[in-house]
């Protein structure tokens, strides 16, 4: 039931976001806090959000910290649609075995749309595969 409510809020927020000008999500460093699985099976709370950040820069680049790695992608933002070009440079450090770096980057690269609600950023993945939930410090 909570996902139905979240889905309705996301749809309403998408409609409102499409009406806006420059997006409020640009220029903020967001910390990945959780993954919400639409099937409610693989929900995940990120134990150390400060190690998984996303900053959408004014110049169209995305600065990403994926635990022990730094990544730079480009992004396209059109209304509530958000997509990443995942071919940018990245460090290739070997993170700890329990790191979420690979999951984070794979899911981030599958972003389709976003919703900003009450200071929380939701990145909605393609094919209704779930949502990445971000807060700002």
Feature map (PLM): residue ranges:
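Lipid interaction determinants
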Residues: 5-9, 14, 19-137
């Amino acid at each position: 039931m909570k996902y139905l409510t979240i889905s309705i809020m996301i749809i309403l927020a998408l409609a409102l976001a499409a009406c806006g000008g420059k997006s409020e999500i640009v220029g903020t460093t967001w910390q990945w806090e959780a993954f919400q699985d639409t099937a409610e099976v693989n929900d995940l709370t990120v134990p150390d959000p400060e190690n998984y950040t996303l900053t959408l820069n004014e110049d169209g680049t995305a600065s990403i910290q994926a635990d022990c790695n730094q990544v730079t992608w480009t992004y396209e933002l059109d209304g509530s649609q958000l997509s990443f070009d995942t071919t940018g440079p990245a460090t290739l450090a070997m993170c700890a075995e329990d790191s979420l770096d690979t999951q984070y980057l794979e899911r981030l690269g599958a972003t389709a749309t976003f919703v900003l609600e009450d200071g929380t950023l939701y990145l909605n993945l393609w094919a209704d595969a779930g949502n990445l939930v971000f807060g700002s410090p």
